């Protein structure tokens, strides 16, 4: 919980306060508390997002293998704590993105971790447009 700025006591109190809204699940020997608004089961097909550096999806967990195979750790973050912007596709980190200057403006450049990764170009374009809209471009 260190990344949240909360103490362990405060985090436990928060879980207690909204406990009736949480579902407890056991997975791979760990207890997970899920809020109904954050559930993704059945809804991540085709879902793509450009996540910023230091996003809590990677920063918030010691074991990141559920969303990122360990062989790609060095592409998402360094040993000394530098995190890179990543592409989340269908619940998995599949690549990096960065802001590149183009003749017709700014747009993110993408690099997938595995050549065989297939992402529908229309989905990738939509994610890029959402990013540009967020920047006000």
Summary of predicted features, one role per range:
Residues 1-137:
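Long, charged, low-complexity, helical-prone intrinsically disordered regions
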